[in-house]
Regions:
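Extended, alpha-helix-rich binding/interface surfaces that flank or overlap catalytic cores
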Residues: 3-122
Length: 122
């Protein structure tokens, strides 16, 4: 073992981290059930480029709205509705405010997803 090898050692993943990784792997492969698939798509798109990116990249976003309503906490559901209205009205300022509101509350989505990940078998 060389000198620098000791800096490359990684701690083994915890069971929770393994389940989290499995959740995202299943989503990537299209093997995650509704409503988690829609929630993960929403979170991924909004986190990477805002609500505008979500609406542009997700062709079925209008269909996903009903599903997201069943799983999103009220504060995020109301924010998504406001973002939808802003997107359709081409109101970039309000859309940016909705992105900020999502950023402040995305821990709520992470908690929902982690709770689901915790149910996955390894």
């Amino acid at each position: 073992m060389g000198f620098f090898d000791r800096f490359q050692r990684k701690k083994p993943l915890t069971e929770a981290q393994k389940r989290w990784n499995k959740l995202w792997f299943l989503w990537f492969k299209g093997g995650i059930e509704s409503p988690y698939e829609e929630l993960m798509t929403y979170q991924s798109e909004v986190t990477n480029g805002g609500h505008g990116q979500y609406f542009i990249n997700t062709l079925l976003w209008k269909t996903h709205m009903q599903t997201l309503h069943t799983i999103l906490p009220d504060i995020l559901w109301e924010n998504l509705q406001a973002a939808c209205d802003a997107f359709e009205a081409e109101d970039d300022e309000t859309l940016a405010e909705c992105d900020t509101m999502f950023d402040r509350n995305q821990h709520l989505v992470a908690e929902i997803l982690q709770a689901h990940a915790d149910t996955l078998a390894l």
